[in-house]
Design a protein with these regions (language model features):
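Histidine-centered catalytic micro-motifs
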Residues: 128-135
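A short glycine-rich, His/Asp/Glu-containing loop-to-beta-strand
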Residues: 17, 112-124
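N- or domain-start disorder-to-order transition segments that initiate the globular core
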Residues: 1-7
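Generic detector of contiguous secondary-structure segments
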Residues: 63-73, 105-106, 124-127, 141, ...
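A structural signal for short, well-ordered beta-strand segments
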Residues: 117-119, 144-146, 219-223
Length: 227
Protein backbone atom coordinates (compact mmCIF):
# COMPACT_ATOMS: atom_id res chain seq x y z
CA UNK A 1 0.00 0.00 0.00
CA UNK A 2 1.01 3.64 0.14
CA UNK A 3 0.01 6.91 -1.47
CA UNK A 4 1.37 6.22 -4.94
CA UNK A 5 0.18 9.56 -6.29
CA UNK A 6 2.34 11.36 -3.71
CA UNK A 7 5.23 8.93 -4.32
CA UNK A 8 5.05 9.58 -8.08
CA UNK A 9 5.01 13.35 -7.50
CA UNK A 10 8.11 13.15 -5.31
CA UNK A 11 9.98 10.93 -7.78
CA UNK A 12 9.05 13.38 -10.54
CA UNK A 13 10.39 16.32 -8.52
CA UNK A 14 13.47 14.80 -6.88
CA UNK A 15 14.30 11.59 -8.74
CA UNK A 16 13.60 9.49 -5.64
CA UNK A 17 11.04 8.94 -2.87
CA UNK A 18 10.62 6.93 0.31
CA UNK A 19 8.19 4.02 0.08
CA UNK A 20 6.16 2.45 2.88
CA UNK A 21 7.45 -0.50 4.89
CA UNK A 22 7.96 -3.27 2.31
CA UNK A 23 9.19 -6.01 4.65
CA UNK A 24 8.51 -7.04 8.23
CA UNK A 25 11.51 -6.99 10.59
CA UNK A 26 11.44 -10.81 10.54
CA UNK A 27 11.58 -10.87 6.72
CA UNK A 28 14.43 -8.35 6.74
CA UNK A 29 16.36 -10.54 9.19
CA UNK A 30 15.67 -13.59 7.02
CA UNK A 31 17.08 -11.88 3.91
CA UNK A 32 20.11 -10.60 5.86
CA UNK A 33 20.77 -14.18 6.92
CA UNK A 34 20.98 -15.33 3.30
CA UNK A 35 24.22 -13.39 2.83
CA UNK A 36 26.36 -16.22 4.20
CA UNK A 37 24.54 -18.89 2.15
CA UNK A 38 26.33 -18.98 -1.23
CA UNK A 39 23.69 -21.17 -2.87
CA UNK A 40 21.40 -18.15 -3.20
CA UNK A 41 23.88 -16.12 -5.26
CA UNK A 42 25.48 -16.23 -8.72
CA UNK A 43 28.37 -13.83 -8.03
CA UNK A 44 30.05 -11.85 -5.25
CA UNK A 45 31.58 -8.44 -5.99
CA UNK A 46 34.31 -6.84 -3.87
CA UNK A 47 33.74 -3.12 -4.38
CA UNK A 48 37.27 -2.12 -3.41
CA UNK A 49 38.81 -4.44 -5.99
CA UNK A 50 36.68 -2.89 -8.75
CA UNK A 51 37.13 0.68 -7.45
CA UNK A 52 33.37 0.90 -6.81
CA UNK A 53 33.92 1.99 -3.18
CA UNK A 54 34.46 -0.36 -0.22
CA UNK A 55 32.29 -3.28 0.84
CA UNK A 56 30.73 -6.24 -0.91
CA UNK A 57 27.54 -7.22 -2.67
CA UNK A 58 26.16 -10.44 -4.08
CA UNK A 59 23.92 -11.03 -7.09
CA UNK A 60 21.05 -13.39 -6.35
CA UNK A 61 20.54 -16.35 -8.61
CA UNK A 62 17.05 -17.41 -9.71
CA UNK A 63 14.58 -18.51 -8.59
CA UNK A 64 14.68 -15.62 -6.14
CA UNK A 65 13.80 -16.24 -2.47
CA UNK A 66 10.07 -15.63 -1.91
CA UNK A 67 10.17 -12.10 -0.42
CA UNK A 68 12.43 -10.89 -3.26
CA UNK A 69 10.26 -12.32 -6.04
CA UNK A 70 7.07 -11.07 -4.36
CA UNK A 71 8.46 -7.54 -4.02
CA UNK A 72 9.60 -7.34 -7.65
CA UNK A 73 6.23 -8.60 -8.89
CA UNK A 74 4.31 -6.18 -6.65
CA UNK A 75 6.42 -3.10 -7.35
CA UNK A 76 6.72 -3.37 -11.15
CA UNK A 77 3.06 -2.47 -11.94
CA UNK A 78 3.21 0.41 -9.42
CA UNK A 79 6.30 1.88 -11.09
CA UNK A 80 5.15 1.25 -14.66
CA UNK A 81 2.92 4.38 -14.96
CA UNK A 82 5.85 6.59 -13.88
CA UNK A 83 8.14 4.87 -16.39
CA UNK A 84 5.66 5.35 -19.23
CA UNK A 85 5.04 8.99 -18.28
CA UNK A 86 8.77 9.69 -18.34
CA UNK A 87 9.18 7.97 -21.71
CA UNK A 88 6.41 10.14 -23.18
CA UNK A 89 7.97 13.33 -21.80
CA UNK A 90 11.41 12.42 -23.18
CA UNK A 91 10.03 11.17 -26.51
CA UNK A 92 11.42 7.69 -25.92
CA UNK A 93 9.75 4.37 -26.74
CA UNK A 94 7.85 2.92 -23.76
CA UNK A 95 9.00 -0.66 -24.24
CA UNK A 96 7.67 -2.08 -20.99
CA UNK A 97 4.73 -4.50 -21.10
CA UNK A 98 2.10 -4.76 -18.38
CA UNK A 99 3.77 -7.56 -16.41
CA UNK A 100 7.27 -8.09 -15.07
CA UNK A 101 7.39 -11.63 -16.49
CA UNK A 102 6.74 -10.33 -20.03
CA UNK A 103 9.39 -7.63 -19.59
CA UNK A 104 11.99 -10.11 -18.35
CA UNK A 105 11.21 -12.37 -21.33
CA UNK A 106 12.02 -9.40 -23.58
CA UNK A 107 15.30 -8.91 -21.69
CA UNK A 108 16.18 -12.59 -22.04
CA UNK A 109 15.32 -12.62 -25.76
CA UNK A 110 17.72 -9.66 -26.16
CA UNK A 111 20.54 -11.57 -24.44
CA UNK A 112 20.00 -10.01 -20.98
CA UNK A 113 19.37 -13.18 -18.99
CA UNK A 114 21.29 -12.77 -15.73
CA UNK A 115 19.32 -11.84 -12.59
CA UNK A 116 20.17 -8.45 -11.10
CA UNK A 117 18.65 -8.37 -7.58
CA UNK A 118 21.51 -7.80 -5.13
CA UNK A 119 22.23 -8.05 -1.43
CA UNK A 120 24.80 -5.51 -0.22
CA UNK A 121 26.76 -5.56 3.02
CA UNK A 122 28.53 -2.50 4.41
CA UNK A 123 30.74 -2.48 7.49
CA UNK A 124 32.47 0.45 9.24
CA UNK A 125 34.42 2.49 6.68
CA UNK A 126 32.57 1.04 3.66
CA UNK A 127 30.89 3.21 1.02
CA UNK A 128 29.52 2.99 -2.51
CA UNK A 129 30.75 5.25 -5.30
CA UNK A 130 28.23 7.20 -7.37
CA UNK A 131 27.12 5.02 -10.27
CA UNK A 132 24.20 3.83 -12.41
CA UNK A 133 23.02 0.21 -12.72
CA UNK A 134 22.99 -0.07 -16.51
CA UNK A 135 23.82 -3.50 -17.91
CA UNK A 136 22.50 -3.65 -21.48
CA UNK A 137 20.32 -1.85 -24.01
CA UNK A 138 17.06 -2.72 -22.24
CA UNK A 139 16.60 -0.60 -19.12
CA UNK A 140 13.69 -0.13 -16.72
CA UNK A 141 14.04 3.48 -15.54
CA UNK A 142 13.29 3.01 -11.82
CA UNK A 143 14.67 0.76 -9.10
CA UNK A 144 14.17 0.17 -5.38
CA UNK A 145 16.47 -0.26 -2.39
CA UNK A 146 15.42 -1.50 1.07
CA UNK A 147 17.42 -1.10 4.29
CA UNK A 148 17.48 -4.45 6.13
CA UNK A 149 19.03 -2.96 9.30
CA UNK A 150 17.90 -0.44 11.92
CA UNK A 151 19.72 2.92 11.58
CA UNK A 152 21.05 4.13 14.92
CA UNK A 153 20.83 0.67 16.50
CA UNK A 154 22.70 -1.38 13.86
CA UNK A 155 24.71 1.31 12.09
CA UNK A 156 25.62 4.99 11.92
CA UNK A 157 26.14 6.74 8.60
CA UNK A 158 25.50 5.00 5.32
CA UNK A 159 23.07 7.55 3.88
CA UNK A 160 21.66 6.84 0.44
CA UNK A 161 22.93 9.44 -2.03
CA UNK A 162 21.40 10.76 -5.25
CA UNK A 163 23.29 13.26 -7.40
CA UNK A 164 21.53 14.88 -10.34
CA UNK A 165 23.47 16.57 -13.12
CA UNK A 166 21.39 19.62 -13.94
CA UNK A 167 21.38 21.16 -17.43
CA UNK A 168 23.89 24.02 -17.55
CA UNK A 169 24.04 24.17 -13.74
CA UNK A 170 25.83 22.65 -10.75
CA UNK A 171 24.84 19.14 -9.69
CA UNK A 172 22.21 18.68 -6.97
CA UNK A 173 22.66 16.07 -4.23
CA UNK A 174 20.27 14.53 -1.72
CA UNK A 175 21.13 12.25 1.21
CA UNK A 176 18.50 10.00 2.82
CA UNK A 177 18.93 7.79 5.88
CA UNK A 178 16.74 4.85 4.91
CA UNK A 179 14.49 3.64 7.75
CA UNK A 180 14.45 -0.06 8.66
CA UNK A 181 12.33 -2.14 6.23
CA UNK A 182 11.26 0.93 4.22
CA UNK A 183 11.87 1.09 0.50
CA UNK A 184 13.30 3.95 -1.54
CA UNK A 185 12.47 4.23 -5.25
CA UNK A 186 14.80 6.20 -7.50
CA UNK A 187 15.71 6.74 -11.11
CA UNK A 188 18.11 4.26 -12.69
CA UNK A 189 19.57 6.53 -15.36
CA UNK A 190 17.96 9.98 -15.61
CA UNK A 191 14.69 11.83 -15.10
CA UNK A 192 12.74 14.38 -17.15
CA UNK A 193 13.17 18.02 -16.17
CA UNK A 194 11.47 21.02 -17.72
CA UNK A 195 13.59 22.91 -20.22
CA UNK A 196 13.16 25.68 -22.76
CA UNK A 197 12.29 23.04 -25.36
CA UNK A 198 9.81 21.19 -23.14
CA UNK A 199 11.59 18.32 -21.41
CA UNK A 200 15.19 17.19 -21.22
CA UNK A 201 16.87 14.28 -19.43
CA UNK A 202 18.87 15.04 -16.27
CA UNK A 203 21.37 12.22 -15.57
CA UNK A 204 21.25 10.88 -12.00
CA UNK A 205 23.75 8.67 -10.16
CA UNK A 206 23.37 7.00 -6.78
CA UNK A 207 25.69 5.77 -4.04
CA UNK A 208 26.08 5.36 -0.28
CA UNK A 209 28.00 7.60 2.14
CA UNK A 210 30.66 6.15 4.45
CA UNK A 211 29.31 3.85 7.16
CA UNK A 212 30.72 5.29 10.39
CA UNK A 213 30.01 2.23 12.56
CA UNK A 214 28.11 -1.04 12.65
CA UNK A 215 26.78 -3.07 9.74
CA UNK A 216 24.22 -2.24 7.05
CA UNK A 217 22.61 -4.72 4.65
CA UNK A 218 20.43 -3.53 1.79
CA UNK A 219 18.35 -5.30 -0.82
CA UNK A 220 18.61 -3.77 -4.29
CA UNK A 221 15.85 -4.46 -6.81
CA UNK A 222 16.68 -3.66 -10.44
CA UNK A 223 13.88 -4.47 -12.88
CA UNK A 224 15.98 -5.31 -15.96
CA UNK A 225 18.29 -8.31 -16.24
CA UNK A 226 21.93 -8.25 -17.36
CA UNK A 227 23.82 -9.75 -20.33
Amino acid sequence: SGDWKAIAAEVNDLGGALLPELLTPAEAAEIRGLYEQPGYFRAAINMGRHRFGEGEYRYFTTPYPEPVERLKQALYPRLLPIARDWAAKLDRPALWPDTLDEWLRMCHDAGQGKPTAILLRYRAGDWNALHRDLYGDLVFPLQVVINLNEPGADHRGGEFLLVEQRPRAQSRGTATLLPHCRGYVFTTRDRPVRSARGWSAAPVRHGVSVLRSGERHTLGLVFHDAP
